[in-house]
Amino acid sequence: MARTVIARQYGGIPDLEVADLPSIPLEPGRVRIAVKAAAVNPADLKRLRGEFGRNEKSLPLRLGSEVSGVVTEVSPDAVGPAGAIAVGDEVVGYPVSGGFAAELIAKAESVLPKPPGLGWPEAAGLLLGAVTAFHLVEVAGIAAGDRVIVHGATGAVGSAALQLARLRGAEVFGTVREGREAAVTAFGAVPVPYGPGLEQRLRALLPEGADAALDTVGSDEALDASVALVHDRNRVVTVAGFARAAELGIRLLGSGPGADPGTELRANARLPMLQLAGEGKLIGPPVIEFPLDRVQEALTLVAGGHAGGKVVLLP
């Protein structure tokens, strides 16, 4: 039996409960993982609400797409992106299904080595934000000498995008809430406060405009400022605010209508992102830990939109 977060129906946070579910045999190409930590993301809330579609036959619903843990069983034909997987390996699982649990069965293609110097919670919460950020940076063509605006520069995706852009030699200006400026300056970027007058504050720092803008916020304020300052609209990319972005002709990335999912690019970025993290060149956001049985509190914090770090469940 394994303690597992489930929802017996699509709905909201109150529908979540922790239940003991029986272990099931491994199918070919699968790996069993004893979960040490599982990251909580806004996408988990969307899935719970049925925003990604509803399949009543798949109930009870299980959430969680990012985990870290230890391999306890491997099917004979299971080979991961980094090669053979063995019992006892410390791993990261992404993307997976049903990660909010003490035990998880994952496809071998989703199982990657955990960098030795990375803690369980930090490892669990790294990849979704990092590969999304890599997608933004890659599509925008960020290169040395570019002047780049990153909106939402202290979030999991925004902070990773800021760091990746800096690693490429770009000069970065990160928009932030008041009081969070230090999280931007720590990575060698210039903080710019949100709020009325954002475009004017950015223009004062960038009188000749910017070369690119990477948006993780989706607000009209962020998107309008990006279009006003970036000369080439093809170098303004967003993972949020799709309706407004479509009106402005901004490139859309992710799972929204008309967006570029970047499936292969993101999958191929997982190992390089883990390597950067292992070398201390890519730092994730602060971790906020909850035990598994406080899953409702954890998702409530994420739903508020200003968690102040990466929320992680510990089974």
Where do the language-model regions lie?
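Short amphipathic alpha-helix with an adjacent loop that forms part of the alpha/beta core around
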Residues: 198-208
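Glycine-rich beta-strand-centered segment in the early N-terminal region that forms part
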Residues: 22-39, 52-97
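Mid-domain Rossmann-like dinucleotide-binding core that forms the NAD(H)/NADP(H) cofactor-binding site
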Residues: 130-195
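Glycine-rich phosphate-binding loop and adjacent beta-alpha segment
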Residues: 220-282, 292, 315
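N-terminal Rossmann-like NAD(P) cofactor-binding module of classical short-chain dehydrogenase/reductase
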Residues: 92, 213-214, 237
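C-terminal capping/lid region of NAD(P)-dependent oxidoreductase domains
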Residues: 281-285, 299-315
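NAD(P)H dinucleotide-binding glycine-rich loop of Rossmann-like/cofactor-binding domains
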Residues: 46, 65, 78, 90-152
